[in-house]
Every structure is written in C-alpha cells, then in structure tokens.
Amino acid sequence: MALNKRNINNIFYIFVTTHLILWTVVPTITNSNLPLDTIEALAWGSNLDWGFNKHPPLSAFFPEVFFQIFGPQDWAYYFLSQIFVVISFFIIFKLSQEILNDGTLSLLSVFLIEGIYFYNFTTPEFNVNVCQLPFWCLTVYYTWKIYNSKKIELYDCILLGAAAAFGILSKYLFIYLLVAIDLLFAYLIFFKKSKKFDFKYLVSLEVFFVILIP
C-alpha cells in the first residue's frame, strides 16, 4: 500500500522520537561517566570565552546553558546531543522533500543518514562535531534554496548567513563547506554564467560577519 503524506510524516515523527529517547536513555543507563569531550565542554563553559585555541565557543555554550538549568545530571547532556541530531533530521527531511519531491524517498533519506556512524553511535558525546550538525544542514538547505530559486528571497540570504556564522562558531573546519559554496557560486556566476550576480548575496556575507564580529 502506498504511503500518503500523513502516514509518512507520522512515521518520521515516530522515528525521530524513538531516536531521541533511545540515544538519551541507553547511554544514561550504561555509561558511568560523561564522555571526555562533553566534560571538556562543561569545563570550558564554566569560563566561557569567545573562542579557544582548540575549538569555537558554541560547543561549550550549549552545555553551560543546560548545566545552569539541569545541573550535573548526565542524562541532560545526552539529551542535548540528541536535540542537535534530531533537528538535523528535520532539516534533511525537508531538504529531501524539496529535491526529490517524493515523501517516501525523503523518509528513506533520513533512514540512510541514521545508518551513518556519526548520527548514531557517537552522538551521545556532545562535541564540536555534534554541535555543527544542524548548522551544516541549515547552510546546505538555504544554499540549495538560493541556488534553485529564480527569485532570491532576502530572508533566505539572511538565514544562510546566520547558519554559516553559527557553523563557524561550532567548529573551525566548517570553513571548508563555506569555501566550497563560494567556489560553486563563483563558477556559476563568472565562468559558466548560468546565474546572474545578485546583491542579495552580499546580505549573507554581512549577516555572517556581523555575528562573528564580537
């Protein structure tokens, strides 16, 4: 029987809820201590700065927020990590729907992502890799919207700039994705000439640098 849109959405919600609960409860029960990267993030968060020689500040900021709310409860930091993963699943699901225009294939896309090591077994350890996931997905999503749209929307450019900035504030190596995006649009505009330069592109850069200036 073919799946309708409502059934697909219900399956997706059941899946992400199951993932959230499973990967929060299991490490809470089985681990005697928090993972080392999470402990390190909590230590940095207690003396939060705009950046460290090893990592940017966001991977320390979010654990510190949860520490202020929940205190030294291990489950809270496993839960925090899964929130980031689940948000990524929502973005991937949305992006897949726009690209594939097929609900079943979009659902399968999320299932395939779940099978990747970095979206399951390593996710209880909140670190820069987990922290960057939703911002990476958002950056790709809004890049796709700008690339695929005949009329570029200003808010897409604003959100792209914000997602890219928060990505850099999550992990320094996020810059590789941004360089790849810049090279793609430079090629499309100046060499292939399949797209025209739009000053709205500069809005993304402005938002990006405004967020990073502090």
Outline where the language-model segments fall.
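Extracytoplasmic catalytic/substrate-binding loops of multi-pass membrane glycan-assembly enzymes
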Residues: 26-41, 50-65, 71-76
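Membrane-interface alpha helices of multi-pass inner-membrane proteins
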Residues: 47, 156-172
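Transmembrane alpha-helices of multi-pass, membrane-embedded glycan-processing enzymes
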Residues: 63-67, 80-91, 132-135
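Membrane-interface transmembrane helices that cradle and orient dolichyl/undecaprenyl
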Residues: 97-100, 139-156
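Short acidic/glycine- and proline-prone juxtamembrane loop motifs at membrane-interface regions
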Residues: 121-132
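Transmembrane-lumen/periplasm boundary regions of multi-pass, lipid-linked membrane glycan transferases
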Residues: 166, 175-214
